[in-house]
Amino acid sequence: MEVENKLNRMTAAGLLIAIGIVYGDIGTSPLYVMKSVIAGNGGINTVGRDLIIGTISLILWTVTLLTTVQTVIIALRATNHGEGGIFALYALIRKKAAWLVWPALIGGAAILADGTLTPAVTVTSAIEGLKGLEFGKGNVPVSNQTTVLVITIVILLVLFSIQRMGTRIIGKAFGPIMLVWFAFLGVMGLINIGGNWWILQALNPYYAIKLLFSPYNKAGFAILGSIFLATTGAEALYSDVGHVGKGNIIGSWPFVFVCLSLNYFGQGVWILNNTNMHSATEINPFYAMIPENIRLASIVLATLAAIIASQALITGSFTLVAESINLKFLPRMNILYPSDERGQIYIPAVNKMLGITTIALVLFFRTSAHMEAAYGLSITISMLTTTILLYEWLVLKQGHNLANLLFVIFFSTINILFMGSSLSKFTHGGYVSLLITLLIASVMVVWYFGNKVRDQNVAGNAYVRLDEYTDMLTNLSHDDNYPTYSDNLVYMANVKYNKFIKREILYSILDKRPKRARAYWFVTVNVTNEPFTAEYAVNTFGTKNVINIQLYLGFKKQTSVNVYLRQIVHDLIKDNTIEAQPQEYTTTPGRDVGDFKFVIVNDVISPSTTLSSYKKWLVKARVQLQNLSLNPAQWFGLEFADMVIERVPLILGKQEPERIKRVAPVDYSKASLNKK
């Protein structure tokens, strides 16, 4: 309750932070929305008053319905301990029905796909404003698209390279910069409106509906694909509620909406006053309506806004992946914390994939106009899936009623219309967005359902009580019939409730070739919410050589298990919890600790598994993903330790070994090797 009250609170500082973090994507939409509409209708010299008024009406009512109503008014109510976003929403309702995992997986994959497209299209659109701009007398340094691409790629390379340092310092400038940006949008819009208040007819939704069926609209319903670009970024208002608070989003949105609306009004008036321009499709009304003496400053400001929008998407992608890992949608990855706040994270693997994909998209599409064809489709998918999950949440809270039914029908219809119009651009680049979404969704499906199949079909008991095997381990430790495998045999094992351990761990010690050791260590690493926690707890089960260690490490601490364990051993020997391990041959006089061997146990599917081909493939693919996702030596800080990775059979399904029939040996008593 205290968390909810804090998030509902609105403060001046909170409003500024919200403007800097939440609205980057939707705030850069004026850079390309009207340009895309004009290009789709044949160029500026072919448009008329009905088209412009209808277009602006469509933009305003799309933003009103999808951003203001669906997101700000409805979605912000569905928070999970103050956190928002599609995965937080899914976590609230996942027990309601098993099928809800599908819209969550697909929607999450679509948002991650958008994380590659947003930096590409926003930065390219901003830099394209430099093309043809004179610096001094007749000096045009950016005269072609190749130069635009070079500048764009350099900016993106710098942006992705600095992610490891976090955004704590530069993030403080986001709010003031975006505040200036939105004020600039509003002022430029007002200046270009002048006395042409007839443009306010666009506030009437009649003109929006009329345009869809008007002969002046050469694009037909496909125009919605361009219109939808005005609301991309609406999902950020929901996903970032945990960072900035519900009250600050609700309080700052009216200012942002007014500034955006004024700019679209201004662009509309400027277009109708300049329909005699010779350029058919290349003109960008956003830059064209800005006075030449401040155009360079506007490009710098637009570039900063584009970078902030991209930064917000990158940071959001890190958060989304971390949530996916917690929900077992994605395999474990190396997560770093550049600051002392756990909310600020950096995932090297995700950063690398985002950077490579984004730059590849820039090189592939080359212009922002081509990128716009791919942009938007993935977001229509995420909005539709969020609508489905929101409906289930409303039913969970309020039960089945007419209002909830009308909500899902109305907003699903709108989202499907936008998705259909975006699909009309499929062959022009939309397929790229869909391919990225499908690729990410495929990884999630394999990991989630592979885990599910494995957990449902593990033969026998997956976990056993460690305390039931302590006598056997103690006897093996003193059994001279077996050579000593190591003084200290350490298994990185997730011991649950301080006593339950995976059967495969004990299988590795006892069933393969019995591994004799002076001491058996079972280490569990627990990451805490505090940044610098460094604690451990010990349970020896009443023995001197079977030790369960629970490590509690802060999220900023390195997982250096090798270093921590040596200190723990010395502590336990000192207080006589375990026996000393004096060494006869050593370069360190008085050394009383022996050698360590660390064991990581990986699963391989046993040939005895009786699952269907599809389920067997799922589990195999899941194992491959686990092997590719993170090097266990790096994760546990064992790069310089004596470590082995063992494979143990994973037996799934019913055990029905094939019986082979015994027959009498063939009688060769009369056979001869001599040929006659």
From Swiss-Prot:
GO MF: potassium ion transmembrane transporter activity; symporter activity
Taxonomic superkingdom: Bacteria
Pfam families, A to Z: K_trans (PF02705), K_trans_C (PF22776)
Main localisation: membrane
Record keywords, A-Z: Cell membrane, Ion transport, Membrane, Potassium, Potassium transport, Symport, Transmembrane, Transmembrane helix, Transport
InterPro entries assigned: K+_transporter, K_trans_C, K_trans_N, Kup
Topology versus the membrane: Multi-pass membrane protein
Enzymatic reactions: K(+)(in) + H(+)(in) = K(+)(out) + H(+)(out)
Keyword hit for Ubl conjugation: no
Transmembrane region(s): 14-34, 56-76, 97-117, 142-162, 173-193, 219-239, 252-272, 296-316, 345-365, 376-396, 402-422, 429-449
One Gene Ontology cellular component: plasma membrane
Localization per record: Cell membrane
Known function: Transport of potassium into the cell. Likely operates as a K(+):H(+) symporter.
Family indicated by similarity: Belongs to the HAK/KUP transporter (TC 2.A.72) family.
HAMAP family the UniProt entry points to: Kup (MF_01522)
UniProt name for this protein: Probable potassium transport system protein Kup
Organism: Lactobacillus delbrueckii subsp. bulgaricus (strain ATCC BAA-365 / Lb-18)
